């Protein structure tokens, strides 16, 4: 399926028009994770685009999970590499969150045990 969805006007110079704007790689991520990936107000997005030689577009999805759809444009290799990189960063964020929750649970149990001993 050859779909072009680009609405951005500031297409980076490394993206070839129109061939790189067809068939974007797409994945969904929670808005909280997106802030981790791209920084506050997307401050790191242009840097990540430049490093990955790809272009990103974001689309809010009406969902209770506050999902954002990320469209990745560029050459086939750059799209796949950028998607892998972003998904890996998102997975790392989730693992760090889980570790934090586990540490918090352990601390809570320790506090509860300490209160029982007193």
Curated annotation (Swiss-Prot):
Gene3D superfamilies: K Homology domain, type 1 (3.30.1370.10). Signal peptide: none annotated. Keywords: Cytoplasm, Developmental protein, RNA-binding. It is found in: Cytoplasm. GO terms for cellular component: cytoplasm. It holds the Pfam family MOEP19. Induction: Down-regulated by retinoic acid in embryonic carcinoma (EC) cells and in developing germ cells. This is Developmental pluripotency-associated protein 5A. It comes from Mus musculus.
